[in-house]
């Protein structure tokens, strides 16, 4: 597992909930790959999780990964909160169900395949990787908005 991949992720939503998009920039050596997607009715937090999940699903072998996100919800959720959620059968300490548990469970399943360091970066702060991921997420969101316009 000596492949090091750097991933930048972001999510975007028009309204919360509303049409949303996710984007990810994957970098390996001198190669980069941009990916994005959308959902017609979603939340910003679901798009943040989806960006990380879909980026990890692209990787075909075990890697050392650094994931950069401007979402404290994603970074804290996957590095700190998730362990208690699992212990509490996907409930928070107040016994309320964890929001987005379906996505958290899928993301957690991807973790065992890799060695991952999660890093938070300030959004919209001149970080080129974060800016690229944001543009991809916005592209996904705008695609969702256009589809909804076509449907009337």
From Swiss-Prot:
GO terms for cellular component: cytoplasm. Binds 1 Mg(2+) ion per subunit. May bind a second metal ion at a regulatory site, or after substrate binding. Keywords: Cytoplasm, Endonuclease, Hydrolase, Magnesium, Metal-binding, Nuclease. GO terms for molecular function: magnesium ion binding; nucleic acid binding; RNA-DNA hybrid ribonuclease activity. Mg(2+) 1 binds at residues 10, 48, 70. It comes from the Bacteria. Pfam families: RNase_H. It is an enzyme of class 3 (hydrolase). SUPFAM superfamilies: Ribonuclease H-like. Its EC number is 3.1.26.4. Its main location: cytoplasm. Residues 1-142 form the RNase H type-1 domain. It catalyses: Endonucleolytic cleavage to 5'-phosphomonoester. Its cofactor is Mg(2+). CDD domains: RNase_HI_prokaryote_like. One of its GO terms (biological process) is DNA replication, removal of RNA primer. It is found in: Cytoplasm. Mg(2+) 2 binds at residues 10, 134. Belongs to the RNase H family. Monomer. NCBIfam families: PRK00203.1. Endonuclease that specifically degrades the RNA of RNA-DNA hybrids. This is Ribonuclease HI. The gene is rnhA.
């Amino acid at each position: 597992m000596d492949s090091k991949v750097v991933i930048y992720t972001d999510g975007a939503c028009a309204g919360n909930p509303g049409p949303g998009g996710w984007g990810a920039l994957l970098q390996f050596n001198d190669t980069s790959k941009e990916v994005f997607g959308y959902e017609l009715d979603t939340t910003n937090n679901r798009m943040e999780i989806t960006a990380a999940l879909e980026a990890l699903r692209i990787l075909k072998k075990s890697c050392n990964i650094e994931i950069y996100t401007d979402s404290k919800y994603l970074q804290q959720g996957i590095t700190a909160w998730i362990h208690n959620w699992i212990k509490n059968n996907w409930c928070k300490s107040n016994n309320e169900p964890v929001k987005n548990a379906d996505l958290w469970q899928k993301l957690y399943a991807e973790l065992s395949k890799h060695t991952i360091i999660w890093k938070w970066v300030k959004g919209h702060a001149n970080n080129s990787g974060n800016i690229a991921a944001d543009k991809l997420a916005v592209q996904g969101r705008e695609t969702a908005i256009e589809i909804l316009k076509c449907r009337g």
